[in-house]
């Protein structure tokens, strides 16, 4: 049995967080295994996103909100105070690191090697050695040396990525997966409290995937048959988590 998890953000902020988390995951993979020039694609995507928007303000507000919420939980009986204090400390450390960091990615803009590659990478087939001889030279270095370079570049984004990954971890933890069924491939739900993220876990043996839409209080899930590329009329068993 193979189950896949699909996630749908219900506001633009969480959408941005998920994109940054996805790139963070790709970059971590590039740090552990040699992917040659492909390691630059998630790095440049991060540069692009952080150029467009300074996420610092939203992230700091969310960190503070979660610190206040977790601090209130400490006053409740029968809670794991050790775990809650650990989360609060992680949030405080992330907040301090983000507050004291320079604008995310600003130093990479001044890196001549990175800047030259960035200008070319958007062009089809632009990684040829006659277009980027400096890349050809860098790729010929031992993997350990390139790994150090990559880590140095990635570290410039960690003050932002670390708290975002933690915030998404906390958001996902607000709801557990519950067994649900979609009759004729459709399910609709609502919530009395604002939602941030819908998570659907479905077994691939059912031959379909969900398309999820909605806003903070209402959402709909349609299941699409992968082979027929149309809405399925079957009853689909799945697991649902609605995270706030």
What do the PLM-derived regions correspond to, one by one?
Residues 1, 33, 37, 61, ...:
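Membrane-targeting and insertion segments and their boundary/processing signals
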Residues 2-61:
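N-terminal ordered "arm"
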Residues 6, 32, 36, 77-81, ...:
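Alpha-helical rod/repeat scaffolding segments in eukaryotic adaptors/tethers
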Residues 14, 18-21, 25, 44-51, ...:
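Generic structural signal for well-ordered, non-transmembrane alpha-helical segments
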Residues 39, 47, 53, 127-128, ...:
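Generic recognition of cysteine residues
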Residues 51-113:
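Hydrophobic/aromatic-rich structural module bridging two neighboring secondary-structure elements via a short loop
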Residues 94-196:
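Charged, well-structured binding/catalytic surfaces in domain cores that contact anionic ligands
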Residues 194-244:
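Extended, charged low-complexity segments
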């Amino acid at each position: 049995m193979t189950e896949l998890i699909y996630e749908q953000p219900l506001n633009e902020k969480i959408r941005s967080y998920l994109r940054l988390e996805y790139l963070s995951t790709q970059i971590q993979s590039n740090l552990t295994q040699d992917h040659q020039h492909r390691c630059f694609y998630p790095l440049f995507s991060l540069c692009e996103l952080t150029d467009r928007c300074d996420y610092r303000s939203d992230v700091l507000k969310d960190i503070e909100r979660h610190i206040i919420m977790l601090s209130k939980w400490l006053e409740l009986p029968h809670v794991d105070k050790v775990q809650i204090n650990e989360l609060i400390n992680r949030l405080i450390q992330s907040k301090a690191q983000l507050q004291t960091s320079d604008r995310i990615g600003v130093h990479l803009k001044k890196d001549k090697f990175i800047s030259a590659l960035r200008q070319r990478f958007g062009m089809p087939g632009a990684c040829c050695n006659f277009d980027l001889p400096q890349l050809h030279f860098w790729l010929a270095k031992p993997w350990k040396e390139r790994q150090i370079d990559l880590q140095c570049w990635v570290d410039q984004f960690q003050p932002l990525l670390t708290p975002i990954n933690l915030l998404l971890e906390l958001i996902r933890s607000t709801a557990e997966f519950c067994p649900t069924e979609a009759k004729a491939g459709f399910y609709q739900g609502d919530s009395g409290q604002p939602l941030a993220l819908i998570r659907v876990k479905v077994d691939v043996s059912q031959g379909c995937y969900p398309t999820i839409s909605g806003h903070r209080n209402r959402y709909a899930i349609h299941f699409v048959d992968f082979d027929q590329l149309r809405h399925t009329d079957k009853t689909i068993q799945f697991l649902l988590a609605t995270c706030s």
